[in-house]
Amino acid sequence: MINVFSRHEKSKEAPLSFRSILVPVDGSDASLRAVEFACSIARRGHSKVHVVHVIEVRRALRLDADLTEEAQRGEEILTQAEIAAKRQDYQIDGELLQARDAGHAIVDEAIERDSDIIVMGVPYTRPFGEFELSRIPTQVMKTAPCEVVLLRMPSE
């Protein structure tokens, strides 16, 4: 069970609650764990959980290019997210997006949906001996107008 408490724990405020939670997914274990985490905190406040998968479109292609293979893979990822939510006994909605830059698309989606928080799963990677965040979570952390939670997977 996951417990989420206010950052003002000593002040006896109620646990954090959110109206709208955005969870970007890429099919990794970390992103699916983020879906489960988001559902566990959403249940507390009867929040909406919206899951997005962003297909990054190369500049050589039109933004609305037909990317059938990528779209099929994206639909599979959204199905995996729905299964993860069902394990938490929670209903989510999902959307497949095409954009030049996934980080910008995630932030734009959070703004459009008036999300209170973005929950992102990040893998534990140490490419040069140090833990390092990849481009997308770094960009979301820098530019999102709402709270952002990064859920890092444990080291293996």
What residue spans do the PLM features occupy?
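Structural beta-alpha unit
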Residues: 1-16, 86-118, 156
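Generic structural signal for helix capping and beta-alpha/helix-loop junctions
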Residues: 58-59, 102-104, 127
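Alpha-helix N-cap and loop-to-helix initiation/capping positions
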Residues: 65-73, 132
